[in-house]
Amino acid sequence: MARQALRSTLWLLPSILLCFPFCLPLSGQHVTELPGVLHCGLQSFQFAVNLSLEAESPVLTTWDSQGLPHRLKNDSDCGTWVMDSPDGFLVLEASYSGCYVTLEGSHYIMTVGVQEADVAGHVAGTRQRLLTCPLALQGKAPDTPNAKVCSPVPVKERLPCASSTISRGDCEELGCCYSSEEEGADSCYYGNTVTSHCTKEGHFSIAVSRDVTSPPLRLDSLRLGFRNITTGCDPVMKTSTFVLFQFPLTSCGTTQRITGDQAMYENELVAIRDVQAWGRSSITRDSNFRLRVSCTYSIHSIMSPVNMQVWTLPPPLPKTQPGPLSLELQIAQDKNYSSYYGTDAYPLVKFLQDPIYVEVSILHRTDPSLSLLLEQCWATPGSNPFHQPQWPILVKGCPYAGDNYQTKRIPVQKASDVFPSHHQRFSISTFSFMSAGREKQVLGGQVYLHCSASVCQPAGMPSCTVICPASRRRRKSELYFDNSTSISSKGPVILLQATKDPAVMLHKHSGTHADSPTLWVMGLSASMVITGVLVVSYLATRKQR
């Protein structure tokens, strides 16, 4: 029984250790998945993450088998290396035999995370990722290029990958395309991708197609050794479609790292983007391209490369993606929309018929093809958008025609920090709700503003444009307001009725409730007292004389 219990404990131990990073350091914190690109090498993890999307001062962290956090840094004793890139990406490499990697069955596992801090500097949450790589990667051959990579290359644009006498198997082992059908053409050639390998002579060989990016890559913008540019590192061969770099392991900014009985050589291939300035704006038509390659050799001989790995720049986040629509309704302080009232400024105080400048905008989106459509806007005396009574402001995107003081739509001007199609602006004249009875009394004197809106694509097209007035609008079936989202003002607007009569203002705001006869008697009495005092003073003066 004791042996059986011991076996059960040993069997459960990896799972218990795996649970520590999730349970101990993160109790009471909000945990979400950390996005990034993982590559499984023969000896290590390689994980690239864009920390510019995380907190202001992100810290890459891991947890040991006891659940204790450790800040990741360059530490050869623990087998971790952290490298920054100018584009904001951080590349972590962690050896499978390092301090923070656990062997779980047939996989190596490691937990990494980025801790996020609040305004006070306290840890508010963690974005976390469990890295897993299979155990058996030795002897893995390069992927054979598929037809999509090989077929589009014209015969006259082919860049030879090896001699014409090479066999199909040896050609594909280099990661190259093979074809013996075209007479006089190179049978082994590079495909429309990045092809790299380590030679027995101790050289890197890297071929890049212009079609690996969209828009196509400017091949003359590629540079080797981004951190240490040296001479003699130009391409050895170049066509209008391909460029080929071949250089020794000890040149062109290559870095070397010794781990055990193996030496790893690394270099980078970077496209320098052409940025043109005009006024206060800068533009570029070049793609973002960054490539890191490594060759691993035995320190006893370079005749047999152990491993070749390539890390490309992680793809950018999509500009268009499904998700909740976040809107904001703000009231501007002036007609130029130069500033807005904050939450602490509510309730706002306005006089009847004064303009209120309203803006509804999309939050957390940077896609210029999105267009914000306002469907309905209305006012209620309470914060509940379904509260009664309601007064329409916009109906199907157009000012409500039944109002004597019609709402005015205000165009959004282009600005460096504003997508015009993400904003809708209008001004309204303030009003008060009246009771439904014959006396028509003012109800409460405050209103809340509400709008329902949706997003349309592409911006600027007739199908995404509201035309007013109704007589000029397209047929009803041509414009849809599906899946609309509602938004309300941050607080109420208190409406006052202005008056220019000081007597009325005095009567309204005085603390007495006396009626007119009482005021008349009090005034007469005061006059008689003042007259009596004056007469007595006059008689006393004459008597002294």
Curated annotation (Swiss-Prot):
<keyword id="KW-0472">Membrane</keyword>
<dbReference type="GO" id="GO:0060478">
    <property type="term" value="P:acrosomal vesicle exocytosis"/>
</dbReference>
<dbReference type="InterPro" id="IPR042235">
    <property type="entry name" value="ZP-C_dom"/>
</dbReference>
<dbReference type="GO" id="GO:0005576">
    <property type="term" value="C:extracellular region"/>
</dbReference>
<feature type="domain" description="ZP">
    <location>
        <begin position="197"/>
        <end position="471"/>
    </location>
</feature>
<feature type="propeptide" description="Removed in mature form">
    <location>
        <begin position="472"/>
        <end position="545"/>
    </location>
</feature>
<dbReference type="GO" id="GO:0042802">
    <property type="term" value="F:identical protein binding"/>
</dbReference>
<dbReference type="GO" id="GO:0035805">
    <property type="term" value="C:egg coat"/>
</dbReference>
<feature type="signal peptide">
    <location>
        <begin position="1"/>
        <end position="28"/>
    </location>
</feature>
<keyword id="KW-0278">Fertilization</keyword>
<feature type="glycosylation site" description="N-linked (GlcNAc...) asparagine">
    <location>
        <position position="50"/>
    </location>
</feature>
<feature type="topological domain" description="Cytoplasmic">
    <location>
        <begin position="540"/>
        <end position="545"/>
    </location>
</feature>
<keyword id="KW-1003">Cell membrane</keyword>
<dbReference type="InterPro" id="IPR055356">
    <property type="entry name" value="ZP-N"/>
</dbReference>
<dbReference type="GO" id="GO:0032190">
    <property type="term" value="F:acrosin binding"/>
</dbReference>
<dbReference type="InterPro" id="IPR001507">
    <property type="entry name" value="ZP_dom"/>
</dbReference>
<feature type="domain" description="P-type">
    <location>
        <begin position="148"/>
        <end position="192"/>
    </location>
</feature>
<dbReference type="GO" id="GO:2000360">
    <property type="term" value="P:negative regulation of binding of sperm to zona pellucida"/>
</dbReference>
<dbReference type="InterPro" id="IPR051148">
    <property type="entry name" value="Zona_Pellucida_Domain_gp"/>
</dbReference>
<dbReference type="InterPro" id="IPR055355">
    <property type="entry name" value="ZP-C"/>
</dbReference>
<feature type="glycosylation site" description="N-linked (GlcNAc...) asparagine">
    <location>
        <position position="228"/>
    </location>
</feature>
<dbReference type="GO" id="GO:0002922">
    <property type="term" value="P:positive regulation of humoral immune response"/>
</dbReference>
<dbReference type="Pfam" id="PF00088">
    <property type="entry name" value="Trefoil"/>
</dbReference>
<dbReference type="InterPro" id="IPR017977">
    <property type="entry name" value="ZP_dom_CS"/>
</dbReference>
<comment type="similarity">
    <text>Belongs to the ZP domain family. ZPB subfamily.</text>
</comment>
<dbReference type="InterPro" id="IPR054554">
    <property type="entry name" value="ZP1/4_Ig-like"/>
</dbReference>
<dbReference type="InterPro" id="IPR044913">
    <property type="entry name" value="P_trefoil_dom_sf"/>
</dbReference>
<feature type="transmembrane region" description="Helical">
    <location>
        <begin position="519"/>
        <end position="539"/>
    </location>
</feature>
<keyword id="KW-0964">Secreted</keyword>
<protein>
    <recommendedName>
        <fullName>Zona pellucida sperm-binding protein 4</fullName>
    </recommendedName>
</protein>
<dbReference type="GO" id="GO:0035804">
    <property type="term" value="F:structural constituent of egg coat"/>
</dbReference>
<dbReference type="InterPro" id="IPR048290">
    <property type="entry name" value="ZP_chr"/>
</dbReference>
<keyword id="KW-0732">Signal</keyword>
<feature type="glycosylation site" description="N-linked (GlcNAc...) asparagine">
    <location>
        <position position="74"/>
    </location>
</feature>
<keyword id="KW-0812">Transmembrane</keyword>
<feature type="disulfide bond">
    <location>
        <begin position="377"/>
        <end position="451"/>
    </location>
</feature>
<keyword id="KW-0165">Cleavage on pair of basic residues</keyword>
<feature type="glycosylation site" description="N-linked (GlcNAc...) asparagine">
    <location>
        <position position="483"/>
    </location>
</feature>
<dbReference type="GO" id="GO:0060468">
    <property type="term" value="P:prevention of polyspermy"/>
</dbReference>
<dbReference type="GO" id="GO:0007339">
    <property type="term" value="P:binding of sperm to zona pellucida"/>
</dbReference>
<dbReference type="GO" id="GO:0005886">
    <property type="term" value="C:plasma membrane"/>
</dbReference>
<feature type="glycosylation site" description="O-linked (GalNAc...) threonine">
    <location>
        <position position="312"/>
    </location>
</feature>
